[in-house]
Amino acid sequence: LKKRVPVIDQGNSLGFWGGKFGGNFVPETLKKPIEDLEVLFNKLKKDKKFINERDKYFKNWVGSPTRFIKLENLTNHIGGAQIWSKVVSDANGGAHKIYNATVHCLLAKRSGKKIICGDTGAGYAGKMLSMAAKKFGLKCKIFMGAKDIARQQPNVKAMKKNGAEVIPVYSGSQTLVDAVSECMRFWVANCDTTAMCVGSTVGPAVFVRICGWSTSQISRELKAQLIDEFGSIPKKT
């Protein structure tokens, strides 16, 4: 491993890892759309205009920075160290997944795609993606296991209210793993017009990098808030 380079950014330009555990294990049909997304993301994450656009929407739409507060009662109850909390639930939609969804929609707009698809289990990733898609004028398709749809009706209703098409998946266990597979199949068949948003740090390497890059907004805010509150970032003891 290279020193002082995050593990997530190591490997070659297309995310390939060599050595004993290396490889780019995706079906041949996924290779081209994944490589296209990798090239686009590697370019835009260094583009000052794109970063400024991202930061503008994070501030004026997502609601960054979110609060950093001391939990006075819990600190007094437990004693010893001060206990603080980063209130990420302050973000638009109430979940950290809004950062990833926002960046994916910005990438989709830059690539000229009109549709964005995504998978969801509990419904939060789907809800955030439906919100971002509505904000940026994209059609949104959310794949969700039939069992999860029955369990998570509030989030299903929220997605539909935002204009998303919620597509039930009846194959396999009818849960998230099957929704991911169906979403990927749809993306591969429609990659000329459609972008895909993976809701977490899973899947092909580029999706992991996009998610990490997007949600690192939380840690950037936290570092600034720590310095503002304590004068420096607390050291591990």
Residue ranges of model-derived segments:
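PLP-dependent amino-acid enzyme catalytic core
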Residues: 1-237
